[in-house]
Amino acid sequence: MLGSKGLSPTDLRGMTDGHLRVELKNAKEEVFKLRFQSATGQLAHNARLRAVRRDIARIYTVMRERDIGIRSVQEEVSQ
């Protein structure tokens, strides 16, 4: 689950590009819902919004690493 302590950059680097895109889509939907809850005063845990935004940044970072060739899926699997 996004925003949890179990989602680390290492875990993200082990995912395929397709799975990263799915996780990114889910995280963006969650941010939308959390922002709506925050605006209406229903958000109980403000830290959750911050955690999900950071997860989105982590996903974008891993995707960018692959785009510019810093890391690839094969490198992470072999290590």
Curated annotation (Swiss-Prot):
One of the GO biological process terms: translation
Gene Ontology, cellular component aspect: cytosolic large ribosomal subunit
Designated name of the protein: Large ribosomal subunit protein uL29
InterPro entries in the record: Ribosomal_protein_uL29, Ribosomal_uL29, Ribosomal_uL29_sf
CDD domains listed in its UniProt record: Ribosomal_L29_HIP
Keyword Ribosomal protein: yes
Similarity remark: Belongs to the universal ribosomal protein uL29 family.
Organism: Tropheryma whipplei (strain TW08/27)
Keyword Ribosomal protein applies: yes
GO MF term (any one): structural constituent of ribosome
Recorded name of the encoding gene: rpmC
